[in-house]
From Swiss-Prot:
Residues 644-737 form the Fe2OG dioxygenase domain. Its main location: endoplasmic reticulum. This is Procollagen-lysine,2-oxoglutarate 5-dioxygenase 2. Disulfide bonds: none annotated. It is a peripheral membrane protein.
Amino acid sequence: MGDRGVRLGLLMPMLALLSWAASLGVAEETPSRIPADKLLVITVATKENDGFHRFMNSAKYFNYTVKVLGQGQEWRGGDGMNSIGGGQKVRLMKEAMEHYAGQDDLVILFTECFDVIFAGGPEELLKKFQKTNHKIVFAADALLWPDKRLADKYPGVHIGKRYLNSGGFIGYAPYISRLVQQWNLQDNDDDQLFYTKVYIDPLKREALNITLDHRCKIFQALNGATDEVVLKFENGKSRVKNTFYETLPVAINGNGPSKILLNYFGNYVPNSWTQENGCALCDFDASDLSTVDVYPKVTLGVFIEQPTPFQPRFLDLLLTLDYPKEALRLFVHNKEVYHEKDIKAFVDKAKHDISSIKIVGPEENLSQAEARNMGMDFCRQDEKCDYYFSVDADVVLTNPRTLKILIEQNRKIIAPLVTRHGKLWSNFWGALSPDGYYARSEDYVDIVQGNRVGIWNVPYMANVYLIQGKTLRSEMSERNYFVRDKLDPDMSLCRNARDMGVFMYISNRHEFGRLISTANYNTSHLNNDLWQIFENPVDWKEKYINRDYSKIFTENIVEQPCPDVFWFPIFSERACDELVEEMEHYGKWSGGKHHDSRISGGYENVPTDDIHMKQIDLENVWLHFIREFIAPVTLKVFAGYYTKGFALLNFVVKYSPERQRSLRPHHDASTFTINIALNNVGEDFQGGGCKFLRYNCSIESPRKGWSFMHPGRLTHLHEGLPVKNGTRYIAVSFIDP
């Protein structure tokens, strides 16, 4: 038979024995679990940016051991986002693996770092790797790149993703070393293509025992998979779940254009925010200004780019910020001639406390983008400028600690959440549409409504934000940050920040203020804010309703100087003054004539020298004012009566000795009447008042901003008492005629 025949004769019984043993269920011994200290994470980062620090923080959270290659080196691997490249990473891996090639029990995890976060720990990762029963496992992708012509060379897959993704792979050190030792290309050649060609070569794939993580048990590449993944809250933890394969990936990679989705997941994973514990990282790396002797220098950029209501209030609030004025510099761009008087009044106040003020007015004819570039550069060029705080004219900062709070959060870019009252409109977007515009993230409503509170990494913020000065002089050193393609300036800023890898945060940890609506702001009147009751009801109320109005319902401050004549505060001083100014500006007083074309029938039995609200287009505003602020008082003082809040006659009356000094006794054509004093007795006029004849009761010292409310057509016959000198103004409505 010869030696060969003898060996074959011995081998056949052994094979038969093995087959027999297998048929009896005799299995190989289960390999022991790989200890966590036998895992080494390797990544490449020639620079450190926000994405890198996020990756390292997630690794630290799970106690991964990480080795960073390429630190301090020049990146020569090309622009991987927009073209092929990345070969430098393979070259660095090749050099590093020479040190680990002989460690058979060491497992190497290579992963990107700028756009990766860990969602699970080393034990989970190693357990899933061992279950694959392969020496090297690559991330899998539904998209084939960079060479689609290689599709036919990939082995088929029954379930799962078919194509290799080089953003993450795990394997035993000797096998990883053998893999990268095959690299002999240039730094700017493509790493993805290199690994792809190794994998699709059947001999190399078998020799290195490579497989792909087809069902995303270890790696989740987000690009092309946005409809597969959701956020999962369970047992006090936050995870990313792949709903297609019912898996919980360990490493989440926001490859390609999916970085915004990764940023969204990064707000929660790993356990950055949970339903049970809220925000875990809100105070991470925060500072405390109460411990400093010298406050950081801040450039305050103020931008008025369109006619905006309530500007004096906006500007005054900036001066009430709880921050040392000697640490502030001021840059103001005002595009509107309409607001020049407001700016002048503001500067006259500010110049006593703020030493450096730069005003760029409408005469400069700067575009919004040019002005914003100039303001930001005002800080960038000053080495002493620690922060740039940009505030638009439509932001009402009601929290005086806003600036301090933002500085203490210690983020490169951070904005306070501000919203329009009663609406979901805010100064941030939680997601972007494919064309780069607004899309609503899953958590947007919860953040706006305060159901989820924290510090949120977002793709877009505007209106008000704080940027670190050192960031402007490093990552954001390009001066033309607000101009890009045909984008609006705010979108251009955010796009540039995203491309530079600078994270933008929004904070809703505090109540900071609100946004004003500039829609339908008509500047054709003298005091245009009077018309803002619909667009900006909160600001309208703050400016025009008496501060003591709420005490009507809490402290019972309503007075009753005559039977069923109720007296209560309603208007602020400013409301009274502006209403009088508006009427005098219009100037067409009726003259107290009986013949009056403004009313039905054309005849007034008891005429007054007046101007109707309808004449100055204030009728709808006034009726809304009655429904919102007069009707609740009516219900309190006339229990059981529910007013419709409607009036045909709403007008301002002017009494003076020269024109009309008094008004004869009469009943009003109303169920009840309101009569609001618009100026001060003793200061603006002498005399005047109202006498209710049935009760022989007079009120001769009306209070500015206070209203009488009394029944109309039946019981309360009354007259206007003579004005001796000066001019008296009252606002009157005959309600529910």
